[in-house]
Amino acid sequence: MKVLSSLKEAKNRHRDCQIVKRRGRIYVICKSNPRFKARQGGAKNRNKG
């Protein structure tokens, strides 16, 4: 799965790709060709202090 800052091009890679939102993150899933999976956003800073 790729981590991308923008999913605009990722959703147009294949006609079966669809965007879903799970647990506050946006994913592109493609059941017919799983190599097109992608997620938007990076890691959060958890150890602020």
Curated annotation (Swiss-Prot):
Molecular functions per Gene Ontology: structural constituent of ribosome
Ribonucleoprotein is among the record's keywords: yes
Gene Ontology CC annotations of this record: ribonucleoprotein complex; ribosome
Keywords annotated in UniProt: Ribonucleoprotein, Ribosomal protein
Keyword Ribosomal protein: yes
InterPro entries, sorted: Ribosomal_bL36, Ribosomal_bL36_sp, Ribosomal_L36_bact
Gene Ontology annotations of biological process type: translation
NCBIfam families assigned: PRK00831.1, rpmJ_bact
Family the entry assigns: Belongs to the bacterial ribosomal protein bL36 family.
HAMAP family: Ribosomal_bL36
Name the record gives this protein: Large ribosomal subunit protein bL36
Organism: Pseudomonas fluorescens (strain ATCC BAA-477 / NRRL B-23932 / Pf-5)
Lineage: Bacteria, Pseudomonadati, Pseudomonadota, Gammaproteobacteria, Pseudomonadales
Gene symbol of the encoding locus: rpmJ
